[in-house]
Curated annotation (Swiss-Prot):
Stated family: Belongs to the CTP synthase family.
Binding site for UTP: 13, 188-193, 224
Superkingdom to which the source organism belongs: Bacteria
Function: Catalyzes the ATP-dependent amination of UTP to CTP with either L-glutamine or ammonia as the source of nitrogen. Regulates intracellular CTP levels through interactions with the four ribonucleotide triphosphates.
Annotated source species: Synechocystis sp. (strain ATCC 27184 / PCC 6803 / Kazusa)
Protein name: CTP synthase
Length: 552
């Protein structure tokens, strides 16, 4: 039978529960325990698929096509384990399931209530994760902050859960904040005391406290927290701020988090093997090169909107012994001031996914600049579609080319709606989602990176390359290097007469791992590094001249 760890958060939101849950998962896996991590989100949306990136951050897509919270990306990257739609639960999905059951008569005419019907559905979802893959430990993160009205059904459900599966099969872990008060020149435990008091008022006594702080907790502070929160002093864990999230598992291992967890669950505390993770962190902390990459997007004011892209770039930078300087550039500002203003001193350009017409022309201009100036370029999803539009307008002599998403009456719809999307009305959960195969053409950049004939990547899109223009593109030098197995759907495009110019319809960032960077990102960063270390080249009327590269 699986054991269960429930992670709650107190004092403030964005306390880092997801990183703590993911780090615990890594520590347990280092002891050869299997782990699955579940996120319970208190918002009433069925999933985050239709939410604004400014409100929610990125939508992380699982292999089975679920649109989920970005924390699932942390879970996958830290544990190197793929999650599924079972690992993401929202209040909206719970209520939807209960109401559907009521409509079918499943409750035999009874009054449907939060207790027991909503709480039973929540418990059923937790058990479903355990039954699906039978992991040794299921870690469940409860979204929101203790005290929020939205979280109450989830907290009540996990309170009941312990009684039903056995006391020694469940522990409660509370992540909280110990703030430093500059005026008093001391750390304060009172917010944590009140947070634990709130948790205890609904029947949950935390077994472990994970204390977020910007400096070490001294022993006296731990003893105080132990006394007032009724937690053994050895279960008061310091989680001090770190320069990278990948340091957190090592910090928590040193503090004894995994040891305390296993002891409370009556599991063997096996010897951990964190040597690879330690090497990863050491390599990240001592880079030999500096590179600058421009990320040209629509939602650059909120970095979480592109979280997996940033992480994937970081993984590739670590692998190449490089320190990545990421320059966030608004596509709309490029429209106003021109691409050269922002891109003249970067080493590479990445255009990520997105939706809507705002900023599209700026992305197209950025891609044109990268192509003409021999800047390494990587396009993802909408980034690929923009590269197709750029090529059509500037090389294939179709100046009015556009995507049907942005201009329904364009005379040259080089990007068109997928046929299966023609009659779709609802927005939520209706795109081409999840893992699909891609067949890669030999003797292409894509094949040199993947070294495979068929790869599987995650998708999230409604529009595709319009095959009516494929011959016109290939005749002008554009290469279709990856397609669906039947050859119909264009998955990867590239321009061979360029140091590195490749774009894909899928989202490779979702498959990148700290210890195994994705091939497309590795290739991109290696090309960026090669350019950085070589004499600069500037395009002049399709020819290149070499200049001395000024040190920076």
């Amino acid at each position: 039978m699986s054991k269960f760890v429930f992670v709650t958060g107190g004092v403030v939101s964005s306390i880092g529960k997801g990183i703590v849950a993911a780090s615990l998962g890594r520590l347990l896996k280092s002891r050869h325990y299997s782990v699955s991590i579940l996120k319970l989100d208190p918002y009433i949306n069925v999933d985050p698929g239709t939410m604004s990136p400014f409100q929610h951050g990125e939508v992380f897509v699982t292999e089975d096509g679920a649109e989920t919270d970005l924390d699932l990306g942390h879970y996958e990257r830290f544990t190197d384990t793929s999650m599924s739609r079972l690992n993401s639960v929202t209040t909206g999905s719970i209520y939807q399931a209960v109401i559907n059951k009521e409509r079918r008569g499943a409750y035999m005419g009874g009054t449907v209530q939060v207790i027991p019907h909503i709480t039973n559905e929540i418990k059923e979802r937790i058990l479903r994760v355990a039954q699906n893959t039978n992991p040794d430990v299921v870690i469940t993160e409860i979204g929101g902050t203790v005290g929020d009205i939205e979280s109450l059904p989830f907290l009540e459900a996990i309170r009941q859960f312990r009684k039903e599966v056995g006391r020694h099969n469940v522990i409660y872990m509370h992540v909280t904040l110990i703030p430093w008060i500059p005026a008093a020149k001391e750390m304060k435990t009172k917010p944590t005391q009140h947070s634990v008091k709130e948790l205890r008022s609904i029947g949950i006594q935390p077994d472990i406290l994970v204390c977020r702080c910007d400096r070490p907790l001294h022993p006296g502070m731990k003893e105080k927290l132990s006394e007032f929160c009724d937690v053994p002093v050895e279960s008061v864990i310091t989680c001090q701020d770190a320069s990278s999230i990948y340091e957190v598992p090592l910090i928590l291992e040193k503090e004894g988090l995994a040891h305390q967890t296993l002891e409370l669950l009556r599991m063997e505390n096996r010897s951990p093997d964190l040597s690879q993770w330690q090497s990863l962190v050491e390599k990240m902390q001592s880079p030999h090169h500096d590179i600058t990459v421009a990320l040209v997007g629509k939602y650059v004011q909120l970095s979480d909107a592109y979280l997996s892209v940033v992480e994937a770039l970081g993984h590739a930078a670590i692998a190449s012994d490089s320190k990545l300087h990421l320059r966030w550039i608004s596509a709309e500002e490029i429209e106003a001031q021109g691409a050269a203003t922002f891109l003249k001193d970067v080493d590479g350009v990445l255009v990520p996914g997105g939706f809507g017409i705002r900023g599209v022309d700026g992305k197209v201009q950025a891609i044109e600049y990268a192509r003409e100036n021999q800047l390494p370029f990587l396009g993802l999803c909408l980034g690929m579609q923009c590269s197709v539009i750029e090529w059509a307008r500037n090389v294939a002599k179709l100046p009015e080319a556009n995507s049907a998403e942005f201009e329904t009456e364009t005379p040259n719809p080089v990007i068109n709606l997928l046929p299966e999307q023609q009659d779709v009305v609802d927005l939520g959960g209706t795109m081409r989602l999840g893992l699909y195969p891609c067949r890669i053409a030999p003797d292409t950049l894509a094949f040199s990176l993947y070294q495979k004939e068929v790869v599987y990547e995650r998708h999230r899109h409604r529009y595709e390359f319009n095959n009516s223009y494929r011959t016109q593109f290939t005749d002008t030098g554009f290469v279709v290097s990856g397609t669906s197995p039947d050859g119909r759907l264009v998955e990867i495009v590239e321009y061979p007469h360029h140091p590195f110019f490749i774009a894909c319809q899928f989202h490779p960032e979702f498959h990148s791992r700290p210890n195994q960077a994705h091939p497309l990102f590795s290739g991109f960063i290696n090309a960026v590094l090669k350019r950085r270390n070589a004499p600069a080249k500037i395009a002049v009327n399709c020819h290149t001249v070499t200049e001395d590269h000024e040190p920076s």
